[in-house]
């Protein structure tokens, strides 16, 4: 695998409320994905914060500075990917509380990049099978593991780790935001917009699913790595095996507290 690809990156979106978990997240990205030399970008609105400065100085994170108008949950996704350097073609967006605590499958990451290189019809490849593709979804290429997401799947779009063609990720959030503004015109404050983005969850429910299935036409494909089995830890047998959702309803989960202490990056949240 060409682990030094300059056209791939990891993109983290975060806001000051959640900065305290970022050092643990990025430190473990560097520790457990040490052979993966993709650039890491943090899209956020307070670049002068001491934690942001530490991420830059200690871990080589590059900042994408957002305005206050771009700091909403959905708005920040669009602005973050839109402000990446022009040489970035593929992006792996991850939530700020997704913690990688084991080595990724470098061969599968390389294969995902290669698929995007050679097949313009592929817009994304889901790396974490949570949810996994339906068992009867068609195989993308005979002899390969990737499945094509279809109407059998409840979720085509998910915030779980997915490698995206940058222009398709941008197009999705651009259209999603236009639809949200049209269908939720009364959501004007930061809290109201956050309610639509998270509580209504317009991206991961039928609204976003239907949009993604039609965006780009019938030729556009979204692939997913299959789940190894029905047991709960099967999700970690995947190309990017992170611990999802370290913060739930504004509370730091116990596993994240323990992980931070064990790894030497305690989280005060």
What are these regions (language model features)?
Residues 157-174:
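Conserved nucleotide-sugar donor-binding
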Residues 103-132:
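Conserved donor-nucleotide/metal-binding helix-loop-beta segment in metal-dependent transferases, i.e.
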């Amino acid at each position: 695998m060409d682990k030094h690809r300059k056209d791939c990156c990891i993109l983290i979106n975060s806001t000051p409320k959640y900065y305290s978990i970022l050092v643990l997240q990025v430190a473990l990205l560097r520790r457990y994905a040490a052979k993966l030399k993709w650039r890491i970008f943090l899209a956020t609105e307070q670049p002068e914060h001491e934690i942001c400065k530490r991420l830059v100085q200690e871990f080589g994170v590059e900042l994408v500075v957002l305005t206050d108008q771009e700091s909403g949950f959905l708005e920040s996704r669009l602005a973050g990917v839109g402000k990446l350097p022009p040489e970035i073609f593929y992006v792996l967006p991850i939530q700020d509380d997704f913690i990688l605590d084991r080595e990724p499958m470098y061969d599968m990451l390389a294969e995902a990049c290669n698929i995007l290189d050679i097949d313009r019809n592929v817009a994304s490849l889901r790396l974490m099978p949570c949810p996994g593709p339906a068992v009867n979804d068609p195989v993308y290429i005979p002899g390969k593991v990737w499945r094509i997401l279809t109407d059998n799947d409840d979720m085509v779009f998910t915030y779980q780790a997915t490698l995206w063609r940058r222009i398709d990720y941008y197009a999705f959030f651009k259209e999603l935001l236009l639809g949200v503004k049209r269908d939720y015109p009364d959501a004007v404050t930061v809290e109201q917009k956050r309610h639509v983005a998270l509580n209504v969850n317009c991206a991961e429910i039928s609204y976003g699913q239907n949009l993604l299935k039609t965006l780009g036409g019938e030729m556009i494909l979204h692939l997913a790595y299959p789940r190894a089995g029905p047991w709960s830890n099967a999700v970690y047998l995947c190309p990017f095996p992170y611990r999802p959702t370290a913060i739930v309803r504004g509370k730091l989960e116990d596993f994240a507290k323990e992980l931070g202490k064990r790894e030497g990056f305690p989280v005060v949240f």
